[in-house]
A protein has these predicted regions:
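A structural signal for small-residue-enriched, beta-sheet-centric alpha/beta enzyme cores
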Residues: 1-14, 18-232
Length: 232
């Protein structure tokens, strides 16, 4: 559906204070001896051009989100960071489509890995299995798809940076106990998923990020095989 069906914006300017409060109350954080500091990793998704730009989440919503996570109530679609996400914005917001947040997980033996991604891309979205386009830039009447890559080729000499606000962000969750260098490699591997599903992707007008998060319940003897399994 076209982007204009979005009613509000909820996924920008999320203050980490509510999340920090939740962690501090439960003694979760980096141990500095005298206390545990709740470090919160934060990435912003730009969605001010969808719905009302004055509707913003606050610390109370961050705290409520943590409480909700205890009950495993996550949902794909127009929730959380996906509320104001959109795709196919090569010619502006009038011809883009509404997107959202999605997730997927697999288990191979005792290894578990999953990903959650808020898709807010400049390019179009494709089914990585068969190459079929599922969302993206539309014609002015919003009835048919337009190939964003064709628009890039036709407009590549334009110097002005008119493509802003494209921020696709995600997190990879695994129970493998990776080290920092291995996590860096894992984040790079995860970007292959973007390349399979978003066209164009990794342009100078887009921000694409993946944050790996290991839950570290597997023995380190499994790490080498885990890297191969995650590559699949």
């Amino acid at each position: 559906m076209p982007f204009c069906s979005a009613a509000e914006v909820l996924s920008v300017w999320m203050l980490p204070g509510g999340v920090q409060k939740y962690l501090e109350e439960r003694g979760i954080g980096f141990d500095v001896g005298v206390t545990k500091v709740p470090l919160v990793c934060q990435s912003d998704l730009f969605d001010l051009t969808v719905g009302r730009m004055d509707v913003r989440p606050d610390a109370a919503m961050g705290y409520a989100a943590c409480l909700g996570a205890e009950h495993n109530n996550y949902r794909d679609g127009n929730y959380g960071a996906g509320t104001g996400a959109s795709v196919g914005k090569m010619t502006g917001m009038g011809t883009c489509m509404k997107s959202g947040i999605g997730s997927y997980a697999v288990q191979l033996g005792d290894l578990k890995v999953g990903a959650i991604v808020a898709v807010n891309s400049l390019g179009d979205i494709y089914n990585w299995r068969d190459g079929h386009k599922v969302a993206g830039m539309l014609t002015p009447d919003c009835k048919h798809f337009v190939d964003s890559e064709d628009v890039v080729f036709a407009d590549y000499e334009v110097v002005e940076n008119k493509f802003v606000g494209n921020t696709t962000i995600g997190v990879v969750l695994t129970n493998a106990a990776f080290q920092k260098t291995q996590l860096c490699k894992l984040a790079g591997m995860a970007h292959d998923g973007y390349a399979r599903s978003i066209r164009p992707v990794h342009t100078s007008q887009t921000v694409t990020a993946f944050m790996p998060y290991p839950l570290a319940s597997l023995p380190r003897t499994r790490m080498l095989s885990a890297h191969w399994e995650l590559a699949l």
